[in-house]
């Protein structure tokens, strides 16, 4: 059974670590919850999802507010399929071709697609559920997914005992979604064609933990939320009025709202994405290395990209553009955002799905950031083993500030090593990073202009602060950094437009005594192990993982049969390359690389991600 394991060590474990001579009595900053999408997390994972979602909403608003419009008028294209009908462009093979779009000479790299999604006639409609359903234990049972793939119902905010006609604490309608044998994502959307109601959607687990919330869809007072329903468990969706105090103080107890806000009727649709709703597909011609971004607004809530062979290579029902590099030009905002790097020339399709009514989709294409540099400039990845001062605000955590991180050598005793072993460990880390990035991407990627320079603090002067230099700090601890993680990157930057970013690989959990964490390297060491090569390879793989984020790759599925550098945390044995014997540093160990693999299903994306070529095209020799 797949385990839903991404998260972080509890503060009690993390802050009690005594690693490499660091005492728990030493002053340490308050520990922050990182965004799991940016981090490589320990296997013993507990995430403060309420904190994660608060942080995401804050960063999302800041990203959209700060996004400057790029110059140039977009090409516009309206779908040819008649409004309210299906069948004309519903698959990648029947996509409508948009000529004139692209990054080549005489092409327009900006495109606006408009169209209309017809309703799904197969969604069953059920009568409104009876009050009182104002708390999780009283949630109305929708039967999704057991009832089928979707359900449509209606309700009223203000019709129960807690509305303006009751005690005035505010009406909250809860709906139960029942998990099956496997986890799934459900898309929940409100529609308020009449009345004054401005809806708020929120999702909770069975214990009342807030999992997410959404206020207004672009251009309306309606709401849409993607909800994860774990296998064998239930999730709960709440419909309420938007505004200050919209969430109840205790979702387990009815009547715990703060005030009455807007009231009125609403329609509610809950769908798993497996129905027969309309989808519209449009084809565009891309060149190898083109960085494609798409953002859907209006009534469309999913955007999907297919390659020339018809494979889904990126599907998204969410906006995570706030994780892009600060200066990334890629489209942001809207209901769903996707990004993709074309590994070869060809005709690709952009699909619009999951909704009913008018939509517009912004599609833009760029060449990789480093390709715009002067000849013959190349990007540098600097591996810093000497310790560093890092302002953790760049990782989007709160609280944040300047943090001093200890060097690699401080953690050597945790593996039973001494200062005399430091050079050998560094040799193996550097060799692994170079094999994963310099060698494999040059040998196996499609970028004939691939070029990158990997430097390190032992053998080279520190170039950090110079143009075109990103760094990975290998050292420090949770207590020192204030971030509960093993690894974290500054951004997920398709096209590598940031070019001067920072990632961390913390070493305290990795050097815990055997058995205290499955993410400790000591757990896999025995007298039969080639200890230093194994330690160097494991740290090198995590270092390459964080560099992979900064160069544009998202997490891949860590629990399938294929071990990949971009696998999410939770299966450290795979990331470390431990072979079938369960022992690190033996002959059956596995060479873990960047490669094609399934995007991590627990992060809400779908499709096959080619992390090898996403990373290869991020490091392109300057062409200007």
Regions found by a protein language model. Give the residues of each.
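Fold-level signature of zinc-dependent metallopeptidase catalytic domains
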Residues: 334, 343-345, 360-431, 520, ...
